[in-house]
Structures are given as C-alpha cells and as structure tokens.
Amino acid sequence: MTDKVRNRVQCWPALAQESSCVDFIPARQGATCGSTVVFIPCCGLTRGRRVLCQWFPCLSGGCCSQESSCVDFIPARQGATCGSTVVFIPCCGLTRGRRVLCQWFPCLSGGCCSQHTVNIIGEPPRPVGAPSFEFVEFGRLPSILSTELKLFQRAPVPEDFGIYYEGNADIARQRWTGGEAKALELLGRRLKQEEEAFREGYYLPTQARPDFLAPPSSMSAALRFGCLSVRMFYWCVHDLFARVQANNQLKHPGGHHITGQLIWREYFYTMSVHNPHYAVMELNPICLNIPWYEAKDDSLDRWKEGRTGFPLIDAAMRQLMAEGWLHHILRNITATFLTRGGLWISWEAGVQHFLKYLLDADWSVCAGNWMWVSSSAFEKLLDSSSCTSPVALARRLDPKGEYVKRYLPELEKFPALYVHEPWKAPPELQEQYGCVIGKDYPAPMVNLAEVNKCNANKMNAIRQKLLDQGGSTPAHCRPSDMDEVRQFFWLPEDVAAES
C-alpha cells in the first residue's frame, strides 16, 4: 500500500458514518485497468457520492489515470466488516479484485444479500393484540336490499363464480379450510414441529427433513389470505427458539435465517413494488430476456397435466391439480424441469399455471420464485449446471415410491427398483405390473442428460454475450453464497453431483 493511498483512506471519516448495503462507485464510467473503484457503505448513494467528490474530483467527471496500478483493497480500518469503507484499485480488471474483496465482504459475491438488509432494517414490530368487539353493534341489511345487491345468503363457493374443479378427486388427500381459527390450530401444530427441530439442533424442518406424504404444515395459505398475521408467525417462531435455547441450555446459532422463507417472501414483495411487469419478461427491469423455446407442440400441456414420463414431476403436477398444493421442493423441481433443467420453456407459462391452481398463490412471491429458479433474475450468475435430477431427488426423498404411487396409481405395482425409472423395467415386467410404458404411462419426453448439457451451453452463451457487451445481470439483491442457494432449493451435495 502506498503512503499516498494510506493517507487518503485516513481522510474519510465521513464515509464511516454511512450505513446499509455496500456499493461501489467507479472513478469514471467504463472504469478499466488502473482506475480507482471506491467501495462505500451507502444508505443514500447520492450523499455518498457527494462526500466522495470532495476527495476525488474525478468522480464529478474528471479522469483519475494517475492512480496506483497495483491490485489491492485497503480497508478504512483493520478488522473491517460488512459496511466498511474500502479503496479498490484493479489493474487486471474488476473480476480478480472483486474476488479478493469478497473474502472481506461476503455479500458482494452475489450483490447485496437479503440477510444483510434485514440486519440493517431490524426486527419487525410485534403484532398488536386482538381487537375487542364487546361494545360493537353490527347492523343488518333489509332482505329487500340484500336481494337487490345479490348478496349471498351463505359463504360463496368457487362454483358461484363459474370456477369448477379440474383435478382428479380420487387422488386428492388434502382439503383446506380457511379462517383464523383453523390457521391458529395449524400454527400450534407447526410450532410443535419447530420446537422438535430446535431441540435437535436444526431449523426450517419442512425443508431440512421434507415429508411429501405428511399433511402440509406450511402456513403460506393462511398468510396469503390474511387468516394469520405474518408478524405473529415470525415472533412465535423466534420466541419459541429463545425459550428452547434457554430451557435446554443450548447454544445453537439463531438469527433471521430460522425464518428465512418469510424474509424471502417480504423481499419478493419489495422487488415487485412499482413494477407492473414483474410477472413477465418483456419490460421487466430485473429480468433477463432469455430466448426461451416457443412450444408449438404439446410439451407445455404434458408438463401441466403430468404426462412428462418422469414420475416425480408427473406426481407433483397431478397433486397440484387435485389439491391446489405442492411442497416447496416439488415446486422448485417442476419449475426447473419446465425451464433451464429440461424443456427450456419460459417461466412465464409456469407462473400462470401456478397462479391458477396453487391455493397459496401470491403474485409477487410466485413470480419471484419462478424468475429465480429459471435463472432469469436473483441469480449471481446464469447457470444450468446445478440442475437437480428429478430421478435422483425422487430416490432420495421418496425411496419406496409411496408419494409417486399416491398420485400416479398406474405405477402402484412397480417396485422401488423401477418406480422412479419405469421405462427401465423389462417389457414382460411392465405387462405383469399392468402398466406398459408408452401405452399406459408415457415414456420420458426428453433425454435429461442431453437437454441438461444443451441448456447449460445455451446459458453459458447468454452469459458470455452479456460479458462481451460489458453487461451483467440486472442490478438486484441476490443470494450471498451457495449455502443460501442450497437452503432455498434444498440442493444437497450428493443430489447435485448426480444431476
């Protein structure tokens, strides 16, 4: 480090007062080898830039070609943490220097991470108490007015609005009941599940140990329709964690990650504000314009109807139609298969299908998840190399094929050896099991190994084109690291390796 640079760092006490996510300001537009890049923690970029301009006239439009050419970063103080002032001087391009810098600032490896944002914003308010209706008098409309307004004399059902059931009632196992009373009852069961997990030293039990056969314990539908306060759910889980820690003298790390999915929910809400094109690709400022395949055959219909020839995918899609529900992991694997991990069909088609049939469908959250899964947004780097194989995932999470057989009764006689790859069963056994592949159940519609390789090449070409043009993914918050991605996708090392 030169004395010149060291002295300059000591002249920035004002910058140490800034807070919030870390950003960088290049010494000039199109900064190249040898230019200065100043990393500052900026709550308001305008103020940060104004302060910097007092020390760097080049930021106001001048040129800073005389700066040192060494590759280095200088923290404003020793032991700098996320949010510290850093001077970054690349001589070999931003990539190498950024890699060095990320050792100090993990959030920079994928943009400003949501966990860091949450730490700055602080805890959400606690829920207010239930209102009292003791002295409230409710009026009643005259019957003639009720008739004139065409009010329902009972709670309406979907059929009253011309919406009719399209699934297979014979395989439907889960019926949902709305209302606050049922939501609080489900919350009580969910908290017992959370408590068991905390005692055993883990969290997010529905993801850490997913059970596709058990009754859903997710609170998403109750949150979606306002039957349960999201603040109540958040604080119930965190207060429970604190009690378990204290009562059992445990020292497991806590923090916002124990309710990580709620954080992503709020984050997707934030990203959709003032963006009417959030659920489509065109005119969406945070979405990459990927040239997806325009399906003119029946590929999209086969995916929707559960006729892809891959049992886990088909079972999930039929469960969706029958029950209006899918486990988070199944949503990800079916979405991946439709987009970058299989059919290369636009995520927009998937969003519309999920919004129509998912009971807990939420425009902001649903579209946000689809953009992420398809690598269209919220990605550190366009990638199709880590697509989980539906066959490998099925073997791990449904080893006996019980889930698959529940929603694909045509495969109920297939043993565990063949149930996830029924096309591998010898023809005579298929006859014996009463299900001939290609006749009673479809053969795989694609060769997974081939399409994964092809799709990975497409993504790599798109990424390289962006880099060649000096571009990058749209500016938005992304996962901090691979651990956060794995937690979101439930992507174990061994499953990824088999992909």
UniProtKB/Swiss-Prot annotation:
PROSITE patterns in alphabetical order: DNA_PHOTOLYASES_1_1
Parts forming coiled coils: none
InterPro entries to which the protein is assigned, alphabetical: Crypto/Photolyase_FAD-like_sf, Cryptochr/Photolyase_FAD-bd, Cryptochrome/DNA_photolyase_1, DNA_photolyase_1_CS_C
Localization in the cell: Cytoplasm; Cytoplasm, Perinuclear region; Nucleus
Keywords (A to Z) from UniProt: Biological rhythms, Chromophore, Cytoplasm, FAD, Flavoprotein, Nucleotide-binding, Nucleus, Photoreceptor protein, Receptor, Repressor, Sensory transduction, Transcription, Transcription regulation
Residues spanning the signal sequence: none
Cofactor: how and how many bound: Binds 1 FAD per subunit.
GO cellular component, one term: nucleus
Domain of life: Eukaryota
Pfam family membership, one: FAD_binding_7
Chief localization: cytoplasm
Cofactor(s) for this UniProt protein: FAD
Gene3D superfamilies: 1.25.40.80, DNA Cyclobutane Dipyrimidine Photolyase, subunit A, domain 3
GO BP term, example: nucleobase-containing compound metabolic process
Binding site for FAD: 190, 218, 220, 261, 328, 360-362, 366, 369
GO molecular function: blue light photoreceptor activity; DNA binding; FAD binding; flavin adenine dinucleotide binding
Chain ranges passing through the membrane: none
UniProt note: domains: DNA photolyase domain is sufficient for light detection and phototransduction. FAD-binding region regulates cry stability, cry-tim interaction, and circadian photosensitivity.
Annotated family: Belongs to the DNA photolyase class-1 family.
Subunit structure: Interacts with tim and per; promoted by light conditions.
Entry protein name: Cryptochrome-1
Species this chain originates from: Culex quinquefasciatus
Name of the coding gene: cry
